[in-house]
């Protein structure tokens, strides 16, 4: 059965792997998912990711990050904009949890955080929020 919302699938796979205390998870590849993974790596929410190409299809292998207590580094990961209800925000996007968490946006400048969007003066589609 085909996936209608690939970003929701990406988020769910990461969330489920964290709850199951798995060290890695495999996700079907797309350029958007690679860009999101790069952003999560830069912000310290994941340990690493690699693009693995097989004969059938490429996929992303994401190495999850855990705290010393054993809890996942990602406490909350929630989809905001959905196929049935797209959510856009302008350049004055509000902070998530007073700046403790992040909104991840798809903008004309690529995949960026809410802080970067405010600094660059751009808006975009709010893909998800992470804490």
Curated annotation (Swiss-Prot):
One of its GO terms (cellular component) is ribosome. Keywords: Ribonucleoprotein, Ribosomal protein, RNA-binding, rRNA-binding. GO terms for molecular function: rRNA binding; structural constituent of ribosome. GO terms for biological process: translation. Part of the 30S ribosomal subunit. Contacts proteins S5 and S12. Belongs to the universal ribosomal protein uS8 family. One of the primary rRNA binding proteins, it binds directly to 16S rRNA central domain where it helps coordinate assembly of the platform of the 30S subunit. PANTHER family: 40S RIBOSOMAL PROTEIN S15A. This is Small ribosomal subunit protein uS8. It comes from Chlorobium chlorochromatii (strain CaD3).
């Amino acid at each position: 059965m085909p996936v209608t919302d690939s970003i929701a699938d990406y988020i769910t796979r990461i969330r489920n792997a964290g709850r199951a205390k798995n060290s890695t998870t495999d996700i079907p590849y797309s350029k958007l998912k690679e860009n999101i993974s790069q952003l999560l790596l830069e912000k310290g929410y994941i340990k690493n990711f690699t693009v693995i190409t097989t004969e059938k299809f490429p996929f992303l292998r994401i190495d999850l990050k855990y705290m010393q207590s054993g809890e996942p580094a990602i406490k909350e990961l929630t989809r905001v904009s959905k196929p049935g209800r797209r959510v856009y925000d302008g350049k004055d996007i509000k902070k998530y949890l007073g700046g403790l968490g992040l909104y991840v946006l798809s903008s004309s400048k690529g995949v960026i955080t809410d802080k970067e969007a405010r600094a660059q003066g751009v808006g975009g589609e709010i893909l998800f929020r992470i804490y």
